[in-house]
Amino acid sequence: MENLNRRDLCIALASLATFAAAAQSQSSEHGLPEVMAVPPPPGSAGDPVLDKQRTFPFSALPVVRTANGETRAVTRGVLPTGEAVELHETTLLPGHMPHPAHKHRHSEFMLIREGTVQFDNNGTPELLGPGGVALAASNGMHGLKNVGETNANYFVIAIGRET
């Protein structure tokens, strides 16, 4: 697999912008989707090999606004050691969930940066605040809800493949 170069990155960002514009055109009466889209699983065909050190300035991350808050895709790809990864940041409005509880084959770490969330751990609610981390293990039912009075901000690191 080829390494990600500047040209590939520009094409990927343009594709992401096109996807975001298409998502916004399929909006609710308020101009926003009702539920945040779950990113495609890590390790999908065509994902780049993440074999170069780099930084991801927050101000450069593309923003997709939704009725529940917003998301910022950071990166996705395959590490040289074979693990598929995807990283995004979510801002969740008070009282909202990004989507209903669900499960999938890949695992996810959720790192809470700001706010108070309730992690649905196979039907058992657990509170997490700033600095807290939740692990959604492979095929475990899980979900998040902002139970605080301010926005909740958290990063999701998805590891693994769906097939």
Where are the regions a protein language model picked out?
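Glycine- and acidic-residue-biased ligand/ion/polar-headgroup-sensing regions
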Residues: 105-107, 111-117
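Histidine-centered metal-chelating micro-motifs
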Residues: 97-99, 118, 134, 139-143
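Conserved short histidine dyad/triad with adjacent acidic residue
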Residues: 88-103
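A short, N-terminal "cap"/entry segment at the start of jelly-roll beta-barrel domains
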Residues: 16, 24-84
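N-terminal secretory signal peptides and thylakoid transit peptides that target proteins
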Residues: 1-17
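Short acidic-glycine-tyrosine-enriched beta hairpin
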Residues: 124-137
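Ligand-binding loop in jelly-roll beta-barrel domains
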Residues: 138-163
